[in-house]
Design a protein with these regions (language model features):
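Core segments of cupin and vicinal oxygen chelate
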Residues: 8-53
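Long, continuous compositionally biased terminal/linker segments
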Residues: 42-76, 82-83
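Short glycine-enriched loop/turn motifs at secondary-structure junctions
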Residues: 1, 64-68, 106
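Vicinal oxygen chelate
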Residues: 9-14, 72-117
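N-terminal beta-strand motif that seeds the catalytic metal site of vicinal oxygen chelate
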Residues: 1-16, 71, 128-134
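Long, contiguous binding/interaction regions
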Residues: 26-35, 47-51, 76, 91, ...
């Protein structure tokens, strides 16, 4: 089981504004907060966002470089994916792969894909009828 993930960000304030509503919607609660970071916990796992030092901001994040590609979260249902999609649109957050949405991951993969302020790709995936089948 995953204990935690720590992500360094370019602007902690923007990051928290972006992630707070989404993580709260998924059942996460604020766990820790300090001058240069914040964490959100769900069960025993938590997600940490830390302000990167100025000297490390010159090379922006890109998901195709070595390192993290994206974060994927469980949705409660297809309807939940649709509800979150509507909120994203209301907030002006672009939906990735719009021409294939909500099946950008495949015909049996109902999800919404979007990016946070640092362009970290985020995915919210509905349960599949095929999950658990090997």
């Amino acid at each position: 089981m995953l204990h935690h993930i720590e992500i360094y960000v370019s602007d902690l304030s923007k990051t928290n504004e972006f992630w707070e509503w989404f993580l709260t919607e998924l059942g996460y609660v604020q766990f820790q907060k300090w001058d240069h970071g914040i964490s959100w916990k769900h069960g025993e796992t938590y997600l940490v966002f830390v302000q990167a030092e100025e000297r490390y901001l010159d090379v922006p994040y890109h998901r195709c470089r070595v390192g993290l590609n994206h974060l994927a979260f469980h949705a409660r249902s297809k309807e939940h994916v649709d509800e979150i999609t509507e909120v994203l649109i209301e907030k002006g957050i672009p939906i990735l792969y719009q021409n294939k949405h909500p099946y950008a991951g495949g015909k049996n993969y109902y999800a919404v894909f979007f990016e946070d302020p640092d362009r970290i790709k985020v995915e919210l995936v509905a349960p599949s009828m095929n999950e658990g089948i090997s």
